[in-house]
Amino acid sequence: MEDFVRQCFNPMVVELAEKAMKEYGEDLKIETNKFAAICTHLEVCFMYSDFHFINEQGESIVVELDDPNALLKHRFEIIEGRDRTMAWTVVNSICNTTGAEKPKFLPDLYDYKENRFIEIGVTRREVHIYYLEKANKIKSENTHIHIFSFTGEEMATKADYTLDEESRARIKTRLFTIRQEMANRGLWDSFVSPKEAKKQLKKDLKSQELCAGLPTKVSRRTSPALRILEPMWMDSNRTAALRASFLKCPKK
């Protein structure tokens, strides 16, 4: 599973997931399913934000090409992926600026058009079950919940899906592709079932022992557009949208 994650996700997404797991004292070598889940969630958050701006008239627009003459503001502030201290700093700043109620738990995004925090969920189970779990945990009407599944289903607070159909279709297609690629490698069942995951982990560890002496080569390919991710990610005054040119999973 770890090899799959490193091949199928952009290196910056992988790096952020590694930092998140390290912050919580989790070992990605052991909790490989969680590693894959975090990378998937991060990518969905980026894709949710991608290309969405607010123009001078305060209208939400979708722009896929940079126009240096356009005075545009990013519609979404990405909170997910930051360390906890920085994330809460961003949340507090948003609350002070907009008057929004401070959430009890760290949300994933803030929508400047609708003036609300958003909690993104990606589930391997039934969307309505995961939605209810999120709602019961958050217990706040001020945080909007949007759940996606790997089967193309989705569920959102008051059936308000925030994004246009095309933007949501991009996310659903990516999730379906991840599922298919996992299935092709025999990883999907273990990703869904904890029991299967334990069997897969034992199998992977045994395989690593057998291959310990073999030379390895790691791909470091990064699309040119994604090289702007790190400075854009850390800079609240981002100047360009994160492009949706995520690395495609190489065929085995």
Swiss-Prot record:
Key words of the record: Decay of host mRNAs by virus, Eukaryotic host gene expression shutoff by virus, Host cytoplasm, Host gene expression shutoff by virus, Host mRNA suppression by virus, Host nucleus, Host-virus interaction
Q: Where is this site: Important for efficient shutoff activity and nuclear localization?
A: K195, K198, K199
Q: Does the keyword ATP-binding apply?
A: no
**Major subcellular site:** host cell
Q: Which domain of life is it from?
A: Viruses
Is Manganese among this UniProt entry's keywords?
no
Q: Where is this site: Important for efficient shutoff activity?
A: L28, L65, K202, K203, K206
* Active site residues according to the UniProt entry: E80, D108
Q: Which GO terms describe its biological process?
A: viral RNA genome replication; viral translational frameshifting
Which protein family is named in the record?
Belongs to the influenza viruses PA-X family.
Domain note for this entry? The probable endonuclease active site in the N-terminus and the basic amino acid cluster in the C-terminus are important for the shutoff activity. The C-terminus acts as a nuclear localization signal. The C-terminus is recruited to host protein complexes involved in nuclear Pol II RNA processing.
Say what the protein does.
Answer: Plays a major role in the shutoff of the host protein expression by cleaving mRNAs probably via an endonuclease activity. This host shutoff allows the virus to escape from the host antiviral response. Hijacks host RNA splicing machinery to selectively target host RNAs containing introns for destruction. This may explain the preferential degradation of RNAs that have undergone co- or post-transcriptional processing.
The name on file for this protein is Protein PA-X
Q: Which organism is it from?
A: Influenza A virus (strain A/Port Chalmers/1/1973 H3N2)
